Amino acid sequence: KYSFYHNEGIFWMQITKENLTIIIVTIKSQNVIDNCLTSIDPEIKKIIIENSSDEEFVKSLKEKYQNIKCYLTGKNLGMGSGNNFGIEKSSTRYVMILNPDTILKPDTLNRIFEKSKNLEFAILSPLSDDKNYPNYKTKKGTQIENNDLFEVDQVDGYAMILDKEKFNNNFFDEEIFMYL
């Protein structure tokens, strides 16, 4: 079920539903996570890291959604440690780090799957259409608004796909608590 592409003696693997796991780190996000989860194709694996000991929250997610694994941490690990925990639990080559208040458009992942053909990358990140969160700018300061691939110096953490093979198990710095 994996798609491989050959170009100049190099093979690249395309992201697919089968080789992607979406990781969502949350702390008592019942009020927003349903919108996020319903925006994700039910066939895609999902790992929820709940930074509390709220067993009812986890139970309700498991009852409502398929292809979901939930882990209670018992305490607030923060984003870095929580994402590392989720990545460690994933069995796929690619992981998407997604904030619980992010809603994917219906075609977002299919467009990313298509763009990943013939592409060697470490991180892919979609553009946001939320006016409160402006998109990337080029080094010249020009706002990016199109659908083409482009390189950036940094990505926003609300939604990003990582190729685990490019990171040698060095994902997020756990000394940086980030926010939660």
Predicted regions located by residue number:
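Acidic helix N-cap motif at the loop->helix transition within catalytic regions
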Residues: 34, 54-63
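A conserved acidic beta->alpha catalytic loop
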Residues: 39, 48-58
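Glycine-rich, basic loop-to-helix element that forms the pyrophosphate-binding segment
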Residues: 73-90
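Conserved donor NDP-sugar-binding/catalytic core segment of glycosyltransferases
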Residues: 102, 106-137
